[in-house]
């Protein structure tokens, strides 16, 4: 009887859900960057070039997932597939990493990218 009780205690203790504090300001900033790119690519809304490039840089460096967008003399995606792959990667990253997305994490990611 004692063994079963101990096994149940260990089982229930190991099933605790992990809670985190989500920094809504940073999550909203991340989503705003995605929405800016989405506005330009899906809705053909004119966006400021610097804002577009800043959003690409932010998302790429914070997530560690490089963009397939062009940003030399012209900017944007060569095709819809590249755009969709980037969006899926960045949105997937956000869903998996909301707990670690803090101001210090973002600042660190951006400072190592632009020393």
Where are these regions (language model features)?
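Sec-dependent signal peptide recognition
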Residues: 1-8
